Amino acid sequence: MPRKLSVTLLLLTASALAQTTAPAPVPAAQPSAEHRPAASGAVNPDLYYRPAPDAMPQDGVPRGETRGPYTLPSQAYPGTQHTYWVYVPAQYDPAAPASLMIYNDGQAFMAPEGDVRAQFVMDNLIYRREIPVMIAVFINPGRRPDQPEPTLRNWGDRDTNRPAEYNTLDDRYARVIVDELLPVLYKEYNISKDPERHGIGGSSSGAIAAFTVAWQRPDQFRKVLSNVGSFTNLRGGDAYPDIIRKSESKPIRVFLVDGRNDNRALSPDGSYDQRRDWFYQNVRMEQALTEKGYDVNYSWGIGRHGQKMLQTVFPEMLRWLWRDHGVSTDPHDTVEQSVNAGKTNQ
């Protein structure tokens, strides 16, 4: 049976930590229209979520290096290019194959002033050996050279190739990741080619894109991190539960996160479109995956559409997705992973 997160426990823990040890949270940037939640009463449910302690640099923990930006011209989407950054942990050893994690909407996952701050989380979890040593790639949606780079305030829904790449249920974005990005990474870094050691994740449209990559290419990616996934009828994403039920099971592990105050497709006139209800469709995804015997976990909270809830549960998502990585039982092997002490925080 998959282990389900206790949202109540997470909220209480996050609240207590925020009052005792965690620095005040960085105010979030305003989302674009596609990410802006509908009003849901006087109380903002996102206020109950705080950055996890592991989203902060910790004393004594060596920091990884985030390299880039780099530009990746696309053959799958001619005339466009993808900007990406590569996170290399302090513990990376070129002689030992590392695991791999890809983050769609990379700027939103790596921004130091953002909600997730994935590079700090990975610094801390790798140091404590709660996840394997892994290279991470923060990749933005494709755009033409004359279009602006996505930012925390503008994820690119109106002025990049994001809607076509992320929401369409075909294999073209998987080709960007597998056929265009991976060969570049393999040339530069010693990354394991075992698909069990490859993960991909994202938020909103970036989450359904992550699932599509693993669905199309389970020979390359078998771990999916999905936050407020757009499994809705933007471009047919609400069909996935039925597709899952009708298809042979694939060796994919999935962690889904969403909140009851996500976009619920309620119009001012009282009409309701179930196919565009984010929370409902995420629950449908979990049910379909469970019925087919997938390794699936989920956390249903009260958050809106965005990354506020994710900032609390993100470390646990990584731990769960990578829970079966190798563990040393040598009684003399008790020191945290600190290969490069020169990068320890000051």
Question: Where do the protein language model's features map onto the residues?
Answer:
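Bacterial N-terminal signal peptides that target proteins for export
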Residues: M1-V7
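Non-catalytic cap/lid and distal C-terminal segments of serine-dependent acyl enzymes
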Residues: Q19-Q346
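Short coil/turn motifs at helix boundaries and re-entrant loops, enriched in small/polar
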Residues: L10
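N-terminal signal peptide c-region/cleavage motif recognized by signal peptidases
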Residues: T13-S15
